Amino acid sequence: MEDPLLLGDNQIITGSLKPTPTWRMNFTAELKNLSRMALPMATVTVAQYLLPVISVMVAGHRSELQLSGVALATSFTNVSGFSVMFGLAGALETLCGQAYGAKQYAKIGTYTFSAIVSNVPIVVLISILWFYMDKLFVSLGQDPDISKVAGSYAVCLIPALLAQAVQQPLTRFLQTQGLVLPLLYCAITTLLFHIPVCLILVYAFGLGSNGAALAIGLSYWFNVLILALYVRFSSSCEKTRGFVSDDFVLSVKQFFQYGIPSAAMTTIEWSLFEFLILSSGLLPNPKLETSVLSICLTTSSLHYVIPMGIGAAGSIRVSNELGAGNPEVARLAVFAGIFLWFLEATICSTLLFICRDIFGYAFSNSKEVVDYVTELSPLLCISFLVDGFSAVLGGVARGSGWQHIGAWANVVAYYLLGAPVGLFLGFWCHMNGKGLWIGVVVGSTAQGIILAIVTACMSWNEQAAKARQRIVVRTSSFGNGLA
């Protein structure tokens, strides 16, 4: 069994932390505590993200048309489906994380089951939209050949979306209890499963891009299976996997109360990136622009999952400590997360800049595409810095339960600043894809600044009181779950 997530009485950091000369010792202890969770969570997130990336790479090497179609479908399905499932699960980071900190163990399983049941009808509605994706793209002025490939790919992704409706809540169920090593083992096993399955379906069975999409679905369901087996039979989940049927309706209500703004927060952010990809299809030479911006988005997103892992670990620490009534420890966890982000962003930006002339070949054999990617590499390095900062503070928002503030911050940053700047530079200033990506950088920078201001002005004592009201008082009908 892994180490307890919450700190014991004999450890350096306690709930009565005061600004004394021992602050450096307390920070060091919290940094170690956060790092033990951040590294596995970052690895888990990278492994999960690599599944669709591998599918894009395998399909992209078949032809430029396949790459463009898959890129277009990936953009649309991310913002209309996968971001919704990921965002809704953010409610569990607040509810399950604070319930664990408050030692209200029976609530954790009930929240998780309620989330899974609530996700299924949403998947059905999204799937209907995906069935008509090709016609939608054509009506928006996209290339008919690219739209046909994209529509077929999206339909084959529907099983993957349904799997995410289960996988995301199960991931948060384990994550908020600090059970990150099982998540790590399951994610790596799934990645190793996905690679041969994708190659077999695409090349051996000759299914092309559709095979790449089906491989994602098979791999996601494989991950769901092994996660569910662990939850069912592991002694680590004995106190938390129960379900209180009488409180199902209340759990669903609370799930949507925090899940809807959490999903909005995620979808608004993701939608700017996908909107710019769609806009690139209206530029001169749309196949080149769409392919290059897709590579930039894939690279940026692949890096983003690393600080996202740090943000997930920070969310665990913040939510657990707020639930336990330790607001100053939660505040210290924020500083530790920012410190880890700075180290990670510096290293990754430097590596990308050094490899800027060659990394485009991982996605395409076209020299024209690779040269264009090299030109955009300095902007990607800046994206690494600002996106990572926002990811860490986004974890603070989910752990604290102020997703609604994060959603409004994203509206201002991306739709009032980032998107207008990107469209102006891309179309009116004829900077094409480079101008669109500058808009991304502007939006991400504004998001980070707004979240930083909100975090700096936050009353941690008030957040701890709200956590108790949310978990202990408001839902007193739940069982404690303790022996």
From Swiss-Prot:
Cellular component terms per the entry's GO annotation: membrane
UniProt GO MF annotations: antiporter activity; xenobiotic transmembrane transporter activity
Top-rank taxon: Eukaryota
Keywords: Membrane, Transmembrane, Transmembrane helix, Transport
InterPro entries for the chain: MATE_euk, MATE_fam
Record membrane topology: Multi-pass membrane protein
Any Pfam family matching the protein: MatE
Keyword RNA-binding listed: no
Subcellular localization, as worded in the UniProt entry: Membrane
Presence of keyword Transmembrane helix: yes
Transmembrane segments: 38-58, 69-89, 113-133, 146-166, 187-207, 211-231, 263-283, 292-312, 334-354, 376-396, 405-425, 436-456
GO biological process: xenobiotic detoxification by transmembrane export across the plasma membrane
Family that this chain belongs to: Belongs to the multi antimicrobial extrusion (MATE) (TC 2.A.66.1) family.
Stored PANTHER family: MULTIDRUG RESISTANCE PROTEIN
Name of the protein this chain belongs to: Protein DETOXIFICATION 6
Species per Swiss-Prot/TrEMBL record: Arabidopsis thaliana
